[in-house]
Amino acid sequence: MQNRNTYEWAKKMTRLISVLVMIHIITRTSISNAYPIFAQQGYENPREATGRIVCANCHLAKKPVDIEVPQSVLPNTVFEAVVKIPYDMQMKQVLANGKKGALNVGAVLILPEGFELAPPDRISPEIRQKTGNLYFQNYRPNKKNIIVIGPVPGQKYSELVFPILSPDPSTDKEAHFLKYPIYVGGNRGRGQIYPDGSKSNNTVYSASATGRVSKILRKEKGGYEITIDNTSDGGQVVDIVPPGPELLISEGELIKVDQPLTNNPNLGGFGQGDAEIVLQDPLRVKGLLLFLASVILAQIFLVLKKKQFEKVQLAEMNL
């Protein structure tokens, strides 16, 4: 009897573990397709040697993105880097379950070495209000200059404000008073490719063979099974279309290999941009201010001297 109870307990535990594993897999798949988590998992550096940001591997459509930073900053100061990801707020994308929903956005900000996310105690109330409830994180624990955010609701955060702390060359010997490049990548909407290379339901599906569409079966949970009578070998090919894309073909139609079976439901896309920022030497700024002050004083003295000379000339003429 005891052995039987032990067996039943082990059986229940096995089922529970199986359910938890399945939940983990489903959740992981959903998250990994959400920019920019996938890039963190699959790439040591999000920017390739060619300058291309790897997020474009999953988000195939090209869309604009913009970044605004100050022209120059002083050492050890907090400033804003504003990333703008514009899109039509009325658009609804295809979700993983095939239904329509709002678009999310995400971004990766690649700063020069030494620049990093500002600690909470250094962020002013004004900047804190602009950042809202956003949760920023480093791309890697050892890469504090690369910051990622998302996915977050695009209707609320199409403009992302990153609070950035500039380095101090007096304490950081790797930092220098120079002009530096800043790179940004930003997307709106879901990707078209999953981490394992398979397609998401947010892309176009094409025929895998040439032939006649003999059957289109609408699946109970959405999506289609399309049977194609292959003209090359006389066999049949079944193409699976997940929920989301809309069919463009019908039964009895002759189609060719790679011909689109569905529309392309993707409304989002990825873009990248860059900007430049100067880490300004405070002594140079003070020197410039002193120079400007000396020029202004020289102009004032020149005007006074000129007026004094005119008075002397006028007095001599009266004599």
Curated annotation (Swiss-Prot):
Presence of the UniProt keyword S-adenosyl-L-methionine in the record: no
Keyword entries, A-Z: Chloroplast, Electron transport, Heme, Iron, Membrane, Metal-binding, Photosynthesis, Plastid, Signal, Thylakoid, Transmembrane, Transmembrane helix, Transport
PANTHER family: CYTOCHROME F (PTHR33288:SF10), PTHR33288
Subunit structure: The 4 large subunits of the cytochrome b6-f complex are cytochrome b6, subunit IV (17 kDa polypeptide, petD), cytochrome f and the Rieske protein, while the 4 small subunits are PetG, PetL, PetM and PetN. The complex functions as a dimer.
Gene3D superfamilies in the cross-refs: 2.40.50.100, Cytochrome f large domain, Single helix bin
Membrane topology: Single-pass membrane protein
Family of the protein in this entry: Belongs to the cytochrome f family.
Gene Ontology cellular-component annotations: chloroplast thylakoid membrane
Alphabetized InterPro entries for the sequence: Cyt-f_TM, Cyt_f, Cyt_f_lg_dom, Cyt_f_lg_dom_sf, Rudment_hybrid_motif
Record-listed heme binding positions: 35, 55, 58-59
Membrane-spanning ranges: 287-304
SUPFAM superfamilies: Cytochrome f subunit of the cytochrome b6f complex, transmembrane anchor, Cytochrome f, large domain, Rudiment single hybrid motif
Protein name: Cytochrome f
Entry's localization field: Plastid, Chloroplast thylakoid membrane
GO molecular function, one term: heme binding
Segment forming the signal sequence: 1-34
Organism for this UniProt entry: Pinus thunbergii
Coiled coil (residue ranges): none
The protein's role, per its UniProt record: Component of the cytochrome b6-f complex, which mediates electron transfer between photosystem II (PSII) and photosystem I (PSI), cyclic electron flow around PSI, and state transitions.
GO biological process: photosynthesis
Cofactor stoichiometry and binding remark: Binds 1 heme group covalently.
Cofactor: heme
One Pfam family here: Apocytochr_F_N
